[in-house]
Amino acid sequence: MLHMHIRDENGRHSLDVEGYREAERVVRAAVGQEMVIQITSEAAGIYKAPAQIAAIEALQPEAVSIGLREIDQPDIGEAGVGRFLNGLARNHVMVQVILYDEKDLLRWQDLRQRGVVQDAQWFLLFVLGRYSVGQKSSPRDLLPFLNHHQGAEPWAVCAFGAAENTCIATAAAFGGHARVGFENNLLCKDGSTAPDNTALVLQAVHTAQALGRPLATAADVRQQFGGR
């Protein structure tokens, strides 16, 4: 799965619909269906919830990551959050719900238990150490999520800094998945600067294989998360 951001002509984060469509076209031309393309709906201090929702509803992408706290806003309301997420699921958009701490996870579980967010093939992302000193992650940051995760949703982690690979190993050992790469970290596990994004991905691959975790194909991902 490729996690995709785009930027405008000034290098700023963008949710431009046509920009995303062009980026998806270029990637598809290169890899065909052998990769799942997950776009971001991230606010990045630029967009508000209505604009984020409008962009994703217009795009109807193959997959998207959505920060729960970014869309769970008073001007959207619980009903609006439910309509948005449930609508994506009905259209077989693979939705990864980003949770920054255990409070986000508890809020997600509350929305699920009360039926605001309906049953679907949701995928959770636990963000480790987002608000730690120096934004450096530790495997210990996973424990509050594991202690509170009561649902059946599969989950992944992302982490910051040189301990990224250790966090990935911890997640893999507990049955989780991982988002890895330059978005959150530039360092290899030995503390050296990674020469490219591939180096970080390969670290994660070798770690998973050492723990007996097989690598998913694009077809595997689409089947597990209800893709089209």
Question: Could you tell me what each predicted segment is?
Answer:
Residues 11-77:
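Active-site beta->alpha loop and helix N-cap motifs at the rims of alpha/beta catalytic domains
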Residues 63-183, 193-195, 199:
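Catalytic alpha/beta core domains of metabolic enzymes, predominantly
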Residues 202, 206-228:
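Mid-to-C-terminal alpha-helical segments outside catalytic/metal-binding sites
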Residues 44-50, 128-134, 187, 224:
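Flexible glycine/acidic-rich beta-alpha junction loops that bind and position SAM and/or redox cofactors
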Residues 2-4, 37, 64, 178-179:
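Hydrophobic residues within beta-strands of alpha/beta enzymes
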Residues 1-23, 127-129, 185-190:
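Glycine-rich, proline-tolerant flexible connector loops at the mouths of alpha/beta enzymes
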Residues 11-41, 84-92, 143-152, 198-212:
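Alpha-helix-loop-beta-strand connector modules within alpha/beta enzyme cores
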